[in-house]
């Protein structure tokens, strides 16, 4: 699919053109066309934007699926499934072993081998519930959106945070695309003038809206909440997003706040062998050799049994005789290795077929951190 195709046959709304063309120009876009009156008409498309993602300390090249659409009159014909298979194959050929997306239908994508890997939490805190008596040694300074320290701080955060995407220039453009002009950025600096955390926020109608709040250490976390408290005379409540998958209510003296959680990103391992070659496990774990019987109806190269040797924090495919056997779908395998669910929990849910001893030993080997995914492309 070319830019001309999109301009002439697809995206006719000027606002959509403006918002999506920067992404689509840099994405790998596949489309399905129909011939109507001797003219090609784009009826479906599947776009993948390349990004890097931290998966347990390893920087993976991944594909971010975006701008998936089919005209209503062409749904139900398997077009999107064919485009997805072709697109995932192209990702595999370019050495990308993992993809993620934000689903418009979780059941639909689950049926195609995708599974939930992260959460988004939202919270509402009354002004009287904002933490007080915080006296951190650093200070907070507001900066411009294009401040280099702000962007470098996120890169530092991504390098130490499982699941976080590394933002390139386009990702930053998308991050601020729909924000109001009054949106502000505040950075927390420690006593040595080193940036250690930031928050992106907007104050409107007596409400502080926090788009993102990240920190490299506890000091920065508390320092930013101290900054929030400094606004208590200007606001009635704080509304924010939390991608850490850890409720914040327990942190507050008055924990009676409104907090909601919902699934956010879905992921998919495109190529088991490629993914495992980069994957890290717990170096302090007991190690062991496991066979995984994987079922993948969409991508045939993932169908089969993979024997993986976990040793010293690394994983390798091997011909050794396995000590334990597990069977699962590619979606379950994805959510397990990304840390969203433990093997024991998946066994209880009937998603894994194995002995309890096998899943207990596997859980001792794997890391268990839910991915931090906050970006939308």
Features from the language model and the residues they span:
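Conserved beta-hairpin
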Residues: 28-44, 183-202, 350
